[in-house]
Amino acid sequence: MEIVKEIFRSYDIRGIYEKELTNDLAYLIGRAFATISKGKIIVGHDARTSSNALNTNFIKGALKSGAEIIDIGLCTTPMLYYAREFFKEDYAVMITASHCAKEYNGFKLCDSNGSMYGDKIKDFLNLILSGNFKDGIGHVSTYDLTFDYKKMIINKITLGPRKIKAVVDCGNGTTCYFNPEILKDLGVSVVPLYCEPDASFPNHIPDPAVESNMVALQEKVKEVGASVGIAFDGDGDRIGIVDEKGNLVKTDMFMLIIWKSIYKTCLNKTASFDVKCSEALKESLENLGLNTKFNRTGHSYLKKAVKENNYDFAGEFSGHVCFNDEFYGYDDALYAAGRLLRILSNTNMNVSDYFLDVPTYYSTPENYIEVGEENKDKIVNAVLEYAESKKYEIIDIDGVRIEYGNGFALVRKSNTGPYITVRFEGKTEEERDLHKNEIMNIINEVRND
């Protein structure tokens, strides 16, 4: 069979079902994963219409290679991560395409080091292409983790005396089956929005990082007078927040709320966040007396950094946040929501009150520019050379982030397509636009060359 190599991406395997990602390929993925695994394999899947078939064929392949399978069935990605803790097994597979459009599906793979990414995905593809699989007779057992996951969340999150009304937008994704009910059990007054499972995503794609997907949540918060709005992505590992006024709270500012609640008691005084985050976050954290450190964008890099540096808390602009002070160090948006609700329920402060002392910056959204695979490195290198010639302060752990002192410019190549991503910021709108125009001129010169 012909394999579309491009669906083996930096962090996962993801493609259009039946066109790029077939049931036959799912079988081979199962054979290959069972070949590299040590111990039992936990497998779960999201609510997409193709997930059951991919799950079945993955298990068939894994059994053919002698795997012992624990099939936890329908779940969110954080539930699969928790299953690794619950069963004390390392190797796990989540069948999901997260926030992608309805025609997509995919596989997230975990080994003894956590989420597999980068060269491990390349090596995994090469194993499939070689066909050098183990043979054996496996066994599959099933387990519904819902009760245990719910019990874990409730044991870790106890709300205070203030009653909180929260609008919860599940975007018709897999979190519909779990998150609203668990939040109700915590004592939250939940106003559901798009909490009916529908794999066609009729209202919006379940991606809270896209501002247009948050408009209905913003309006609903204002309509019902809620304390907060909470959005979950398709598989439950990313969060989006709206304040009591209906304003978007970007993830870097959500992280600031968390840090303000833990900085006095946390053991590790370094706050880590990805290169897309605002200077306002960096300045605010340093004003609290914390050290700050930029990290590469990507949930796999985030979890690796948390584990290696024993950070108490870290996150990235896209909505992945990892708690390691009272939790397991992986990205669970329901737990993240619980931590925010715990803070709010123990104070009379509103969400917006946490930003009254935050320095003002004007930022663009993160924008994707299609440039073709062949131009991604050229553009990043051209911007780097230009910045060096200007003797700008540069952070180059993930593309190029130019630190102007009154804002920044970020240019990095996307790991998921033929794009570069850009973001610009200034202390005034004019300064932001100056930074943007300066760097976009370099980008356009390369594109038009």
What are these regions (language model features)?
Residues 41-104, 182-242:
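N-terminal small/polar loop signature for handling phosphorylated ligands or for N-terminal nucleophile
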Residues 92-98, 102, 221-243, 248, ...:
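Glycine-rich phosphate-binding loop
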Residues 69-78, 248-251, 273-274, 295-296:
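Active-site nucleophile and cofactor-binding loops and adjacent substrate-binding regions
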Residues 1-68, 91, 142-166:
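An N-terminal, well-structured beta->alpha segment
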Residues 105-224:
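Gly/Ser/Thr-enriched, mixed-charge loops and adjacent short helices
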Residues 266-423, 429-449:
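Phosphate-binding and adjacent anionic-ligand microenvironments
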